[in-house]
Each structure stands twice: as structure tokens, then as C-alpha cells.
């Protein structure tokens, strides 16, 4: 909590923001500093590093699943970090919320499609779809292979045991899929349920077209054409009462967040002080730990950050 609050205090939102220059508490004291203070990034970085060191000493670490030859399986790693508990080997959740997540709780109900008695209300907006990297670890507008025109001609097969793309292990997208959804990073497929993606519980592809089985104009359909997939068991079929509806933890904080917060704070301070050479290796270490787990190429320099 301390590291998160110090990161907030260092951010331009409240660090020297003229919008809050006269914002005072009941005692008449300024709540936020009226002039920008780069040293707040140092305090944030120190708090994040302390949190990392203490967490790792206590046995916390990034959740990673490996394939048969010991290599990282980014699909299963980024999927199960949101599903598995401490007792199942997940040592990443530093601040869990042990609240029920049964079908009639709003999240799971809203993330299910209409034909299977779901509300279809947990939609994903296009901006988030666009924010995920391509398979090469690049923003979509920086990857010349990215296209929003036409449909794929081939099946995208990768080295993973994940089978929730087409219903077959290792197949991420089938032929005939809108190219916007092709050749994206693993976290995209774990997080977003898009059109023509395999629905394990329904044993068919999703149909988010207007007047489709999962689409509008019904109010029980996502108007963006996407549903959230993260933390939802793809086998869930509320209509038949099948699939996995067991309670799952929520995560107020994961070790991955602290890694990125530490890198951000150290990077921002380096911008002010011109200490890229001294801090580059440390910054990239923690950013690349996240990228490696996600199955995308590492950053080689700070020019990308």
C-alpha cells in the first residue's frame, strides 16, 4: 500500500499539478505540493524495491507454467495467474480478496454470453483491444504486419497447451478470423473474448454479430462486440450448469504490479537526472521479467519505454 501511494504522490496528477495548487485540508494546509518534485520518484522507487525484496524473501514470485521441455508457456502462465490459488502454486498474489465468485455474482454472470443464460454485460472497449501488443511485442501501429483488413488464411499454431482459441491444443486462431485478432500477444487472447473464438462450454464459436447468438440488439450482449475473458473459466455454461464456478480470489495487488511500478519510478527519476546509463539495466530487468512471462520479446534499451 505504501509503495502504491508513494507512486501516486510522485505522478504528475498530483505532483506539481496546478489544478491542485490551492487544494487544502480542513487545517488549511496544502494537500499536494504546488511545484514538481522529482525526488518523489526516488521515494516511490525505494518503497517498491523494499516491497519486492521482502516479498521475494517471503516466497512470493511471478507465476509461471512450463511446457514438457521446461520452457515458459505464456498462455497458461498468464491465464492461471488469475485462476489458481496459493495452495495450487500461485505465489504471485500479494494482496488477495477472498470473495465468492459464483455464477450469480455480477462479474461471472456479466461475462457469460446470452445464449448460455449470461448477462453479456462485462464488455471490453476497442481501446483496450488496440492496447495489446502484437506477437512481436510491438504496439499495433508500429508493427507493419498488423492489419485490420481481411481475414486470416491459416491456423495460428504455437507451443502451448492452451486450447481455448479453437478448441484444439496449441491453436490460437483458426483460418477465416478477422486479421485484427491474429498474431497478437498471448495476454490478448487470455483477456478478450472476441468474435469467432471457440466457446468451450457451448462447443461452438462465439457469434457477436448483430442478430447473432451472442450479439445485439439484446441488452444481454456487449455492444462493443467483446466480452472480458480474464478470470473466467472458458468451459462455463450457466445454461447447462456445467463448467467451473468455484470461488476464486480477487487480486488487489500482484508482485507483477510492483515490478512495473519500481521500473516506472526509477525510469521517471532517470529522465529528470539523466542517469539512464546507471539505471538502465535495473529498469529493464523488471520490465523484461513481465514481458518474458507474457511470451513477448524483451526490450533491449530504454528507447521503447
Locate predicted features.
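Acidic/polar-rich alpha-helix caps and helix-coil junctions
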Residues: 1-123, 146-303
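Extended substrate-binding grooves/exosites of carbohydrate-active enzymes
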Residues: 131, 140
Amino acid at each position: 500500500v505504501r509503495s502504491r501511494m508513494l507512486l501516486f504522490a510522485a505522478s504528475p496528477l498530483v505532483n506539481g499539478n496546478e489544478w491542485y495548487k490551492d487544494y487544502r485540508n480542513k487545517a488549511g494546509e496544502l494537500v499536494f505540493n504546488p511545484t514538481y518534485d522529482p525526488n518523489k520518484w526516488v521515494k516511490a522507487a525505494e518503497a517498491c524495491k523494499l516491497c519486492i525484496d521482502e516479498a521475494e524473501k517471503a516466497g512470493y514470485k511471478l507465476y509461471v507454467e512450463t511446457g514438457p521441455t521446461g520452457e515458459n508457456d505464456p498462455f497458461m502462465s498468464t491465464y492461471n495467474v488469475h485462476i489458481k490459488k496459493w495452495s495450487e502454486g500461485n505465489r504471485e498474489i500479494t494482496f488477495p480478496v477472498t470473495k465468492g465468485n459464483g455464477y450469480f455474482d455480477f462479474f461471472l454472470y456479466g461475462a457469460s454470453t446470452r445464449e448460455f443464460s449470461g448477462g453479456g454485460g462485462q464488455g471490453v472497449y476497442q481501446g483496450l483491444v488496440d492496447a495489446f501488443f502484437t506477437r512481436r511485442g510491438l504496439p499495433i501501429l508500429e508493427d507493419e504486419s498488423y492489419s485490420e483488413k481481411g481475414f486470416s488464411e491459416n491456423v495460428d499454431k504455437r507451443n502451448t497447451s492452451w486450447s481455448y482459441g479453437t478448441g484444439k491444443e496449441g491453436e490460437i486462431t483458426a483460418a477465416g478470423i478477422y486479421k485484427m485478432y491474429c498474431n497478437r500477444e498471448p495476454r490478448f487472447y487470455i483477456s478478450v473474448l472476441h468474435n469467432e473464438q471457440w466457446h468451450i462450454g457451448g462447443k461452438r464459436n462465439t457469434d457477436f454479430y448483430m442478430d447473432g447468438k451472442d450479439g445485439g440488439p439484446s441488452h444481454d450482449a456487449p455492444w462493443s462486440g467483446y466480452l472480458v475473458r480474464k478470470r473466467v473459466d472458458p468451459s462455463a455454461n450457466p445454461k447447462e450448469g456445467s463448467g467451473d464456478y468455484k470461488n476464486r480470489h480477487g487480486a488487489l495487488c500482484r508482485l507483477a504490479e510492483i515490478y512495473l511500478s519500481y521500473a516506472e519510478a526509477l525510469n521517471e527519476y532517470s529522465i529528470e537526472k539523466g542517469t539512464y546509463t546507471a539505471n538502465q539495466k535495473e529498469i529493464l530487468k523488471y520490465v523484461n521479467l513481465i514481458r518474458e512471462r507474457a511470451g513477448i520479446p524483451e526490450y533491449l534499451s530504454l528507447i521503447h519505454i
